[in-house]
A protein has these predicted regions:
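Phosphate-coordination loops involved in phosphoryl transfer and adenosine-cofactor binding
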Residues: 10-11, 91, 197
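Generic short beta-strand
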Residues: 81-86, 154-156, 205
Length: 228
């Protein structure tokens, strides 16, 4: 899915910074495998380490978390790092996710990287990670939204009776697609609470605008722990 969402080709080079126990890291990396392109695993997340890796390895796609992007911008704004010392012309896409993204952050980012494409997406472990909802690289006018249903995914906002809510109203985000889990291990009661006719109730409260872009509002529940 990430290969489709990011238009990844064999000429791309993906910089993976999060640890591979994170589903997002694994499945973003899988996009490179599907495309037959290069991927770089980076140990550490300091601004200079990230930018040096992009420069030295000629990375074209970088997945950042909000704190890492903020740290990079702080270093650039303070003058501690000079972009003229780095080879970053091939870097085309800044992908950011795993938490709400402030629109002000992306505006700051584009002051330093005006030619960067931007994308964010949404997912959870029960949906096999990211991609069930994503913004898309052509929708920078919708920064602040998590986006539209991803490739081969459906999404809707429902009330406590699993009925769709009107546009603009807050309800629980439900998703349906090829990555939805089969069950919680050894816990049929918990499984029945979140799986409804193939739909996964995410526990995230959200709303849609008139163009069907989805915005996260709040968290309904905490993560499910799994034990033997």
């Amino acid at each position: 899915m990430e290969q489709v969402h990011h238009l990844t080709t064999r000429n791309d080079n993906f910089l993976c910074i999060p640890p591979l126990y994170h589903t997002g890291a694994k499945f973003h990396w899988m996009g490179s495998l599907v495309a037959g392109s290069k991927a770089v695993l980076l140990k550490g997340s300091k601004p200079r380490d990230i930018l040096n890796a992009v420069s030295n390895e000629l990375c074209t796609i970088v997945w950042l978390l909000v704190p890492w992007a903020q740290d990079i911008l702080d270093e650039l704004e303070s003058g501690s790092i000079n972009l003229q010392d780095l080879n970053l012309s091939q870097w085309r896409l800044m992908h950011i996710g795993a938490q709400p993204v402030p629109p002000s952050l992306i505006k700051r980012w584009h002051r330093f990287f005006p030619n960067h494409q931007y994308d964010t997406n949404y997912g959870l472990s029960e949906s096999t990670g990211p991609g069930c909802v994503h913004l898309g690289i052509n929708h920078t006018d919708k920064i602040g939204a998590i986006g539209l249903p991803g490739y081969r995914w459906q999404a809707k906002i429902v009330d406590s009776n699993f009925n769709p809510v009107p546009v603009g109203n807050v309800g629980e985000l439900a998703v349906k697609g090829p990555g939805v889990m089969s069950c919680y291990y050894n816990d049929p009661a918990a499984t029945a609470e979140v799986l409804k006719d193939g739909w996964l109730l995410t526990g995230d409260m959200a709303k849609q605008d008139t163009e069907h872009f989805i915005y996260l509002v709040d968290r309904k529940k905490e993560e499910k722990g799994v034990s033997r």
